[in-house]
Amino acid sequence: GVGAKLSKVIADNPHLLDPAIRIILEQNFLKSVAEYYSKVFERLEFREKLRTFFTKYDLLVTPTLPVSSVEIGLNVPKEYDKNALVTWVKYTYPFNLTGQPAASIPIGFSRSGQPVGLQVVARTRREDSIFDLCQQLENIMSIYSRQPNIGKY
């Protein structure tokens, strides 16, 4: 995987990698083959659960992120562990793992004026249903006529 391709960079030039990514890769180098395949099978089980879910439902709609924005220069919002990248992308990460098609569109603004995203997820090979819903939402929300509060972010 990516870790194997970057192993030489990690060994010779670790400063070239984002610290949070480097930590994740280094932690994964410590895992045994059995641990690795255990995680692969967990992912496959989760993918099967989603496949079953999408036999009953056409789409799943979630917030894109649990926060409206991240301060410039940070990889993770201040209220989350700076080395735990996936903890704050908990709404998008599962679908990256399973390969589900998904889209995120701006849906409104937070109290502070920062944009808020809505994620739309579909069953495999049903991107058309995502595009249809996103188009309908964009048409009725008129979100693009408003500007976010630039502020300190």
How would you describe each model-predicted region?
Residues 45, 77-78, 135-136:
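Short, solvent-exposed amphipathic alpha-helical segments in soluble enzyme
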Residues 58-60:
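Short, Asp-centered acidic motifs that coordinate Mg2+ and/or phosphate
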Residues 31, 37, 48-51, 56, ...:
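Structural helix-boundary/capping segments
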Residues 2-20, 89-90, 124-139:
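Short, basic, helix/turn surface patches
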Residues 1, 38, 69-89:
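Short, surface-exposed loop/helix-turn segments at secondary-structure junctions
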Residues 1-51, 63, 101-114:
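Short helix-loop capping/hinge segments that flank enzyme active sites or metal/cofactor-binding pockets
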